[in-house]
């Protein structure tokens, strides 16, 4: 009996030792990451916000946030049950309240070595507190600003930033062609995001509309990682006060089988999926019918290259009662009013390359003011509620 008890005790000893070992603390070193870019906000909605920032060393990320100045809530991403460890950090805030101002602080904790057991960690780097305000389709007014076709010209971006009334602007829309093509992450920040965020800061959201040049270059396939949305795509809708915004991706300006693409483009099926989404959205989303104004934001005013032409897109926009389409691409201003002679029932405004468009909408009127970087008024447009 005694022998049996001794054998059982010895048998349980490794398990007890293992249990104690598992609770041993992991090592924390006196080193912390540096936040190199951001934080910035992408396409904030009524109940969601996407916060992005970057660090110089691999880290885990979280966001402390809350209504007003409260930062008691914590959002920490997970992918397949694992906390992401890297230098790019994306945190989605969900179940927010419309039209509410939130405070937030981003936290990055360095991961020194990702061992299988007891990974080595470091200290925190923080940025904040910052704040943002969610959109609200019930608000009686909204003001936002649009620019386009900056094409890696950082001096152009600086002039546009100076021409924007940031105090009155709730969010910034970039209508595409921020690049000639995209080679690297370094270029993406140097030529576009960094100078753009110098105006936006961490408190106002960026709404990005993909242009045809954003489909080009070795880093084009990574662009969505830097302007992510909860939808995980470049087309979606948002409600901003009395305006129902529909963001579309007009793809490329040439056919997929053009040799310059070397058979690496498949925009035809992509655009077919997008058109199916648009048709379903305008047919089923109540805000399309209820909103005082419906506005489409896209890059190419002719809807981009389409095998069967733009007919189905124009027809869908007409049937949905779209009031205004705003685009870029041509590098010069133009305006086409609705009418049977032009085949569309919406106003079409094409923004020039060195111009700023300011949209101010109430429940009764949508007004667009286009100015040059020198402040000179190029065009004003007033659209009454139908």
Name what the model sees in each region:
Residues 53, 102, 149, 172, ...:
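Divalent metal-coordination and catalytic microenvironments
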Residues 106-133, 186-283, 312-318, 324, ...:
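Extended active-site neighborhood of metal-dependent phosphoesterases/phosphodiesterases
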Residues 107-108, 250, 297-301, 329:
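Short, well-ordered beta-to-alpha junction loops that form the rim of enzyme active sites
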